């Protein structure tokens, strides 16, 4: 099913975006302290 592949790909993309956001927030917090 192509829909499952699209959903899994979207989930992977969302997870990577959240990971980069958390990484940037932690980096900015380290620079603030």
Swiss-Prot record:
Keywords annotated in UniProt: Chloroplast, Electron transport, Membrane, Photosynthesis, Plastid, Thylakoid, Transmembrane, Transmembrane helix, Transport
Location within or outside the cell: Plastid, Chloroplast thylakoid membrane
Gene Ontology BP annotations: photosynthesis
Any GO MF annotation of the entry: electron transporter, transferring electrons within cytochrome b6/f complex of photosystem II activity
Topological category with respect to the lipid bilayer: Single-pass membrane protein
Transmembrane regions listed in the UniProt entry: 4-24
Gene Ontology cellular-component terms listed: chloroplast thylakoid membrane; cytochrome b6f complex
InterPro entries: Cyt_b6/f_cplx_su6
Pfam families to which the protein is assigned, alphabetical: PetL
Superkingdom as given in the UniProt entry: Eukaryota
Subunit structure: The 4 large subunits of the cytochrome b6-f complex are cytochrome b6, subunit IV (17 kDa polypeptide, PetD), cytochrome f and the Rieske protein, while the 4 small subunits are PetG, PetL, PetM and PetN. The complex functions as a dimer.
Function: Component of the cytochrome b6-f complex, which mediates electron transfer between photosystem II (PSII) and photosystem I (PSI), cyclic electron flow around PSI, and state transitions. PetL is important for photoautotrophic growth as well as for electron transfer efficiency and stability of the cytochrome b6-f complex.
Family statement: Belongs to the PetL family.
Record protein name field: Cytochrome b6-f complex subunit 6
Gene coding for it: petL
């Amino acid at each position: 099913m192509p829909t499952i592949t699209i959903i899994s790909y979207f989930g992977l993309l969302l997870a990577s975006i959240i990971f980069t956001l958390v990484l940037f927030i932690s980096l900015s917090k380290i620079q603030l302290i």
